[in-house]
Amino acid sequence: MKTPHILMMAAGTGGHVFPALAVSEELSKRGAIIHWLGTPNGMENGLVAPTGYPFHAIEMQGLRGKGIGRLLKMPVTLLSATMAVIKIIRGNKIDMVVGFGGYVSAPGGIAARLTKTPLIIHEQNAIAGMSNRYLAKMATKVLQAFENTFGNDQLDAKLETVGNPVRNAISGVAEPTIRYDINDQSPLKLLVVGGSLGAQVLNDTVPKALALIERPFEVRHQCGRHNEVTTQSAYASEDLSAHEFTVQPFIDDMAAAYNWADIVVCRAGALTVTEIQNVGIAAIFVPLPSAVDDHQTANARTLTLHKAAILLPQNELTPKRLSDELALLDRAACLEMAKKGHALANRQACQHVADIIWQAL
């Protein structure tokens, strides 16, 4: 087989980009040449740059909930973006297009169809996004992380449940029984993660909740870029003398952060849920209420049903409620939650997805 050229489509958030990076690394090891389709100013630029993959940027924006103006411009924008991707596919002799989500997937998938290039899509969330629901009809293969994501019997012949790929560094974190020492009397280590962009409600609520807890915690809080000053101020305005805390805009090494933590308070994006499950760590999920089709609540459902995590809807999130949940936890309770989540994980997802892509070339 000649050296395959694969165009990966992933943009906008870490939930799309990191799984695509994990699979790209595996495909590169097998000899594939990876190209990346993204947007000019998306976070994928900085994440993909260190890999050295050729990066192709197109102008494309989201549609849902963005107003009538963008809706009216969308046909022209989509046509222009699709033509740009056709040029990329032909100019780089692309053998396969693989979509992991983000605004670029729609024009990329359409371009694959028009150039008769095989298309594989992967849906990370428990409820499929609008672009992937559309592209599923024309894709060669449709991959889903959760069962019944697409709910379409017509897709059965090409539909496969594979889990969510995670990076090798995450998979390499020691299992819960090694990390948790139930005899350790030091303060519980609390990791607060608002996703790659941060979560203002966590930035506001967590400091107030900690002020209500007498038992000390050691806190590491990822607040999102541009939120560091206001989050530092939120901590400074409370009496937190019992606690140690660090605030930072972004955590580059999530594997080290998970290895450090006893419990995570976080959103329920697909990547976050999958990483917590793979690592095996106690979690309190606060799903983003504005997420399309409430997919974050659906993402967290398996872990919460198995008592591997606590679900705390944002409309119920108050400093008192969060402090009550945290106050009930000790290392033994965290370990039990972590073991249950770890037992549910699919740690072969990355290799499985790469196998499917390789076999389809």
Curated annotation (Swiss-Prot):
Q: Which GO terms describe its molecular function?
A: UDP-N-acetyl-D-glucosamine:N-acetylmuramoyl-L-alanyl-D-glutamyl-meso-2,6-diaminopimelyl-D-alanyl-D-alanine-diphosphoundecaprenol 4-beta-N-acetylglucosaminlytransferase activity; undecaprenyldiphospho-muramoylpentapeptide beta-N-acetylglucosaminyltransferase activity
- Per UniProt, UDP-N-acetyl-alpha-D-glucosamine binds at T13, G14, G15, N125, R167, S196, I251, A270, L271, T272, V273, T274, E275, Q296
Location comes to: Cell inner membrane
According to its UniProt record, which reaction does this protein catalyse?
Answer: di-trans,octa-cis-undecaprenyl diphospho-N-acetyl-alpha-D-muramoyl-L-alanyl-D-glutamyl-meso-2,6-diaminopimeloyl-D-alanyl-D-alanine + UDP-N-acetyl-alpha-D-glucosamine = di-trans,octa-cis-undecaprenyl diphospho-[N-acetyl-alpha-D-glucosaminyl-(1->4)]-N-acetyl-alpha-D-muramoyl-L-alanyl-D-glutamyl-meso-2,6-diaminopimeloyl-D-alanyl-D-alanine + UDP + H(+)
This enzyme's EC code(s): 2.4.1.227
UniProt keywords (A-Z) are: Cell cycle, Cell division, Cell inner membrane, Cell membrane, Cell shape, Cell wall biogenesis/degradation, Glycosyltransferase, Membrane, Peptidoglycan synthesis, Transferase
InterPro entries documented for this protein = GlcNAc_MurG, Glyco_trans_28_C, GlycoTrans_28_N
Q: Which Gene3D superfamilies match?
A: Glycogen Phosphorylase B
Which biological processes are named by the entry's GO terms?
A: carbohydrate metabolic process; cell division; cell wall organization; lipid glycosylation; peptidoglycan biosynthetic process; regulation of cell shape
Q: In what way does this protein cross or attach to the membrane?
A: Peripheral membrane protein
Recorded GO cellular component terms are: plasma membrane
Pathway as given in its UniProt record: Cell wall biogenesis; peptidoglycan biosynthesis
Q: Which domain of life is it from?
A: Bacteria
Q: List the disulfide bonds.
A: none
| Similarity field | Belongs to the glycosyltransferase 28 family. MurG subfamily.
Q: Sum up the protein's function in the record's words.
A: Cell wall formation. Catalyzes the transfer of a GlcNAc subunit on undecaprenyl-pyrophosphoryl-MurNAc-pentapeptide (lipid intermediate I) to form undecaprenyl-pyrophosphoryl-MurNAc-(pentapeptide)GlcNAc (lipid intermediate II).
Q: What is this protein called?
A: UDP-N-acetylglucosamine--N-acetylmuramyl-(pentapeptide) pyrophosphoryl-undecaprenol N-acetylglucosamine transferase
Instruction: Identify the species of origin.
Output: Psychrobacter arcticus (strain DSM 17307 / VKM B-2377 / 273-4)
By which gene is this protein encoded?
Answer: murG
